[in-house]
């Protein structure tokens, strides 16, 4: 076995596991289930001034203030009207809980390492560092996200105490 093959197998083993899948603009995405804290229905979101457009605001989840990011807007996808399927996935980003708005939660998939391919190269102008890989299940492809990288830089929306920050 070559060193390159061994590295590829180790990487495949590291990416293997359970993923919560969800729909966003008709495409299927997945996040590592260990990063998911809970799934909640849409609720009132309090807008926070002077935040990027994709930051919808904050919610009060059982007494804890959690920032909410709309993944459609984060990915430069047109905002859609909310439906009864629209929900918030609460994820752990470097020890901070954050909510992400998705169109619909699909299922939990157990994806083997050999069923995950590296993200295709789109050239130097396209950043794909937030994609763990492409999960193959049957004839469909699920884009597996590194949710920490997707939301990197957005942790500043809460302080370590979990209180909303903002310089209004």
What do the PLM-derived regions correspond to, one by one?
Residues 1-168:
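An acidic, low-aromatic, low-complexity terminal/linker signal
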């Amino acid at each position: 076995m070559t060193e390159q093959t061994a590295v590829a197998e180790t990487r495949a083993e590291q990416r293997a596991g359970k993923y919560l899948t969800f729909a966003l603009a008709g495409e299927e995405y997945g996040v590592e289930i260990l990063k998911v804290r809970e799934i909640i229905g849409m609720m009132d979101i309090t807008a926070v001034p002077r935040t990027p457009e994709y930051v919808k605001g904050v919610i009060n989840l059982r007494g804890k203030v959690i920032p909410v990011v709309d993944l459609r807007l984060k990915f430069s996808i047109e905002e859609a009207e909310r439906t009864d399927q629209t929900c918030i996935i609460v994820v752990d980003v470097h020890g901070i809980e954050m909510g992400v708005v998705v169109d619909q939660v699909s299922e939990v998939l157990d994806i083997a390492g050999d069923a995950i391919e590296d993200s295709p190269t789109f050239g130097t102008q396209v950043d794909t560092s937030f994609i763990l890989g492409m999960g193959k299940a049957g004839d469909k492809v699920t884009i597996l996200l590194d949710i920490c990288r997707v939301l990197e830089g957005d942790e500043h929306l809460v302080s370590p105490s979990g209180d909303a920050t903002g310089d209004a």
